[in-house]
């Protein structure tokens, strides 16, 4: 059977990234409390395409993804990237996974449990020299009270919900929970999925006792 893809290309154009994008696939990720957690990720997988190739082997992306699906972890990302380069005859490889991650949180006073979902991402790349770059990212909902409005007002201050995106470049494993807690501890108050009246009182008083402007910088200072 004639294989057009494997025939040489004479246009002499190298393409930085070819592959698949936004493929939804079930994965298993590490969970600090329970050991592991099942979720569904939106996945991007790319490799470079040499100037003399017409195209890459698209089916191999999904084949490799299916093999790694039972245990996707930060520790394995480097091996996955090198495996992509090997099986697709590429010099560089890129892998991105974005998924909802669930953590059970208890309300601060009533201790009523509920699940919070956080958007998490893991991104990795391997260049032609074999240098690995790994980034873990979390998006954390928070509550903030404005210290400026509190200063100029006789009563109260304006408050708002927001999202803090924290990205960490790493070489050793890091828990998603640690990154999330780092952000929540830097906010005026963190967010809960379940609140009773006693909890509403608690989070309101805590937020207004802890007005914050620059939550992102506060998170960085706490990490350092």
Predicted regions and their residues:
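N-terminal intrinsically disordered, cationic/polar leader segments
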Residues: 1-223
């Amino acid at each position: 059977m004639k294989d057009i893809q494997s025939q040489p290309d004479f246009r002499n154009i190298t393409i930085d990234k070819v592959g698949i994008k936004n493929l939804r696939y079930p994965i298993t990720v590490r969970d600090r409390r329970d050991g592991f957690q099942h979720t569904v990720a939106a996945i991007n997988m790319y490799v470079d395409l040499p100037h003399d190739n017409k195209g890459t082997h698209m089916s191999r992306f999904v084949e490799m993804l299916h093999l790694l699906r039972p245990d996707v972890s930060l520790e394995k990302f480097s091996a996955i990237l090198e495996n992509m380069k090997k099986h697709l005859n590429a010099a560089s490889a890129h892998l991105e996974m974005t998924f909802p991650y669930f953590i059970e949180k208890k309300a601060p006073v009533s201790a009523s449990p509920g699940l919070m979902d956080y958007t998490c991402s893991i991104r990795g790349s391997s260049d032609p020299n074999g240098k690995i770059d790994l980034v873990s990212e979390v998006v954390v909902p928070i509550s903030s009270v404005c210290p400026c409005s509190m200063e100029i007002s006789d009563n109260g201050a304006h408050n708002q919900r927001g999202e803090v995106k924290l990205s960490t470049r790493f070489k050793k494993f890091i828990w998603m929970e640690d990154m999330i807690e780092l952000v929540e501890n830097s906010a005026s108050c963190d967010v809960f999925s379940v609140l009773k009246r006693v909890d509403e009182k608690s989070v309101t008083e805590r937020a207004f006792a802890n007005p914050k402007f620059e939550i992102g910088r506060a998170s960085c200072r706490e990490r350092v």
